[in-house]
């Protein structure tokens, strides 16, 4: 019985590479000369540092551009609020989302059931498993989910025949 998993996970290696490229560009740009602007990473948490709001926006733009070039969807990023640290310096914590949330998993299961395609969807931790009798049914479910779920990037993996 063919099946696949619906997951939502960023490629952390590409995220790390994008951060390194961002830091390199920030260190060489003229408008950041003499400032302490940078991006740091701890596991799934990124911290953006800058001297003022404008430079923080520029750091964010550089990071988003580098992530886009490395095919990492920016919808994985969850921005925290901007905090003041010593002096005029600012920092912002950005979390990289992982897994299909409970609400999104329920929405996916409901969409699959309402589509009247002969497949079953079940929630498996932070993924949704879809089982069906025909591969064509599974492919039509993938197409339907790509069309209907636009607020979160979805990946489809673990195909079984």
Swiss-Prot record:
One GO CC annotation: cytosol
Disulfide bonds: none
Family, as annotated: Belongs to the YajQ family.
Pfam families xrefs: DUF520
HAMAP family (alphabetical): YajQ
Molecular-function GO terms, alphabetical: nucleotide binding
CDD domains the UniProt entry points to: YajQ_like (cd11740)
InterPro entries xref list: DUF520, UPF0234-like_C, UPF0234_N, YajQ-like_sf
Stated name of the protein: Nucleotide-binding protein Bcep18194_A5887
Keywords, ordered alphabetically: Nucleotide-binding
Source superkingdom: Bacteria
Job of this protein: Nucleotide-binding protein.
């Amino acid at each position: 019985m063919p099946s696949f998993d619906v997951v939502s996970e960023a490629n952390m290696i590409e995220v790390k590479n994008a951060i390194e490229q961002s830091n390199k560009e920030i260190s060489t740009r003229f408008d950041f000369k003499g400032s302490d602007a940078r991006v740091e990473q701890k596991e799934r948490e990124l911290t953006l540092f800058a001297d003022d709001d404008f430079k923080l926006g520029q750091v964010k733009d550089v990071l988003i551009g580098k992530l886009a070039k490395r095919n990492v969807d920016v919808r994985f990023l969850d921005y925290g609020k901007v905090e003041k640290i010593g002096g005029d310096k600012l920092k912002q914590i950005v979390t990289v989302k992982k897994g299909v949330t409970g609400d999104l998993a329920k929405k996916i299961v409901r969409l699959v059931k309402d589509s009247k395609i002969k497949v079953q969807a079940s929630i498996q931790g932070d993924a949704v498993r879809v089982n069906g009798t025909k591969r064509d049914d599974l492919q039509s479910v993938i197409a339907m989910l790509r069309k209907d779920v636009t607020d979160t990037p979805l990946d489809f993996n673990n195909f079984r025949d």
